[in-house]
């Protein structure tokens, strides 16, 4: 049962505030009339060392491409991100200077965090949980089965093959901010027609009968670069990515949005139908 939940941006008024959520944590503690010493587990939403492994292996696999991106990412990781537990302890002491129980701090795999947030508040004792996003540590799409108080991941699709990153690539192409403006791309879709759907299927993503997929990395930069797409992607659609400061949204962009929206929905439906057939679980 969820007792309290809050987003830091609601307190700071900073959209997508990525700082330690001091105000949100303090709110849920106050709301539930608890102190840190009363809490059994404090869980961080991903495993930093696994994510760091993915970054290193990706840069090695794509080398010498991506050196600029690599050189920008490494100082941040070596200075801060590899020491999340220490950082969390320091921040938690702002709520209670006497708190020192590091054993209470746990790290959950990113997609397991998503699955738990969907399954445990649900009315189901058993369900299939399908998670699809940009990328967690390695996983971009996972299938899990939840039974009562247990969760088990059954299948994974790994980076760089990602439906979320494909959608973000089109977010970038149409001139919206990645990891922020995806909802704008979705909102644009009903105003267009999916005339580029087959071009996406034929060039960018190979979808298997069970809904699993591979992305053609010849068209993307996100694995190691500083942008989502490359010139080959732009050439495929006959336009460069829209500059939101100089270019208005045209019917072309609406049709692009409609096309990637249909592709995304079709792949998700294909995945769900395949999983329903394989696992014989009615709840999703």
Specify the residue positions occupied by each region the protein language model found:
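Short acidic/glycine-rich loops and adjacent helix/strand connectors
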Residues: 1-284
